[in-house]
Amino acid sequence: MSQGEIVQVIGPVVDVKFSIGKDLPDINNALKVIKSDDDSIILEVILEQGDGVLRCIAMESTDGLRRGMKVEDTGSSISVPVGPDTLGRVFNVLGQPIDGGPEFPADHPRSGIHKEAPKYDELTTSREILETGIKVIDLLEPYLRGGKVGLFGGAGVGKTTIIQELIHNIAQEHNGISVFTGVGERTREGNDLYFEMKASGVLDKTAMVFGQMNEPPGARMRVALTGLTIAEYFRDVEGQDVLLFIDNIFRFTQAGSEVSALLGRIPSAVGYQPTLATEMGQLQERITSTKKGSITSIQAVYVPADDYTDPAPATTFAYLDATTNLERSLVEQGIYPAVDPLESTSSALDPEIVGQEHYDVATRVQHILQRYRELQDIISVLGMDELSDEEKLIVARARRIQFFLSQNFFVAEVFTSVPGSYVPIKETIKGFKMILDGHLDDLPEDAFRGVGPIEDVLKKALKMGVTPSDPEAKALLEK
């Protein structure tokens, strides 16, 4: 393998000079800097400067690097362990275990993190719904098995909590394989998630990859590809349906932006890298379903300053089948999950996919919530007394629907001391249909807040001293 030496170090960016006339390492190749007999760091070739100089990005801290240090070409891109043995383990961007478990032997199957997306004739689409057990998602923006989902929201509105609940519900109910990729998020959250999954017994069906906030931008740029490579193996070789969770895709963009100027690129809109769309496309086009197996991807997307026109979230929108938008005003009202039922969308909300009854109930819910939003302006200026009887009924039912869209989470039980609930789609449809048809008009609004199926509402109302008068509600309570 060819050898070079360091000629310049600028933060995470390292320039390496190789002898002119010899074969230069390819773009995306991994280079190894030998710091001492038992210490080395990995660089990745990003671009060629001319005169045998390659500009590289470090996957680890560049502390201790100096000019003149020897650099070896590994001859290939960064490669990470793949296969069933990765389940139950935690890795860094280089595929090295960071959970204190045994190292993988040199002859263990590995795969390079840079690959081409599957060809067009290999792709397939699914029309099967992935049940999540979260009412607002299953009813209004159902997720497709093998689809791509984005959880959009500003800081502190609950993106990571929803991702953790989805991992819990899907692992418990669907018995599937998951890959969780932490991209530039808090180390504490990754630590909590690891021990939570260990305690609930789902860790042995999950591979975890972390490149957290404190790591160099090179690691945060590439860690999403590491997680995706592990997921691709289960799809392409094992022929399985895999769930890929990425938290947070914005940090992937942010890391690229951090090194873009150091690489000599002129910034684009809002200071982002000019290659933003290309980088996002290279990642997203690989996250897809083929005739061999599927990858269902659920990605948290941080929205800077709650501005959805920011180039980072706006670029992500184009690749998604469903979007779950989290709204700060709902957090302020104490409605969790704080999913905006009118702004969230899904291509699967189609009578041919979800069935006519589900579609009808969902559109009726959206209609009544939209009408309530329009009436709020009148209410804020003139008060409820100026509304007609029909409008008052719409407001009353809309508020019950809004509260019933909230739900207690299993992963939040440790904070709230209230048990979580998993609600099957059939139960969700039944509950909202009863509210829409007026069977629960005499129950207090608070009975609908933070509950699971509609039976929980009736039990909560009883505890509040209210017995339903509607025959259908009474019959359900007696069951």
Curated annotation (Swiss-Prot):
Membrane recorded as keyword: yes
Stretch forming the signal peptide: none
Membrane topology summary: Peripheral membrane protein
PROSITE patterns noted in UniProt: ATPASE_ALPHA_BETA
Keywords: ATP synthesis, ATP-binding, Cell membrane, CF(1), Hydrogen ion transport, Ion transport, Membrane, Nucleotide-binding, Translocase, Transport
Localization in the cell: Cell membrane
Protein name per its UniProtKB record: ATP synthase subunit beta
Molecular function as annotated in GO: ATP binding; ATP hydrolysis activity; proton-transporting ATP synthase activity, rotational mechanism
Catalytic activities: ATP + H2O + 4 H(+)(in) = ADP + phosphate + 5 H(+)(out)
Keyword Acyltransferase: no
Organism: Lactobacillus delbrueckii subsp. bulgaricus (strain ATCC BAA-365 / Lb-18)
Family that this chain belongs to: Belongs to the ATPase alpha/beta chains family.
InterPro entries assigned to the protein according to its UniProt record, in alphabetical order: AAA+_ATPase, ATP-synt_VA_C, ATP_synth_F1_bsu, ATPase_a/bsu_AS, ATPase_alpha/beta_chains, ATPase_F1/V1/A1_a/bsu_N, ATPase_F1/V1/A1_a/bsu_N_sf, ATPase_F1/V1/A1_a/bsu_nucl-bd
Main location: membrane
Top-rank taxon: Bacteria
Record: residues binding ATP: 153-160
Enzyme Commission identifier(s): 7.1.2.2
One Pfam family this sequence matches: ATP-synt_VA_C
Stated role: Produces ATP from ADP in the presence of a proton gradient across the membrane. The catalytic sites are hosted primarily by the beta subunits.
Subunit and interaction comment: F-type ATPases have 2 components, CF(1) - the catalytic core - and CF(0) - the membrane proton channel. CF(1) has five subunits: alpha(3), beta(3), gamma(1), delta(1), epsilon(1). CF(0) has three main subunits: a(1), b(2) and c(9-12). The alpha and beta chains form an alternating ring which encloses part of the gamma chain. CF(1) is attached to CF(0) by a central stalk formed by the gamma and epsilon chains, while a peripheral stalk is formed by the delta and b chains.
GO cellular component: plasma membrane; proton-transporting ATP synthase complex
Listed SMART domains: AAA
HAMAP family with a match to the protein in the record: ATP_synth_beta_bact (MF_01347)
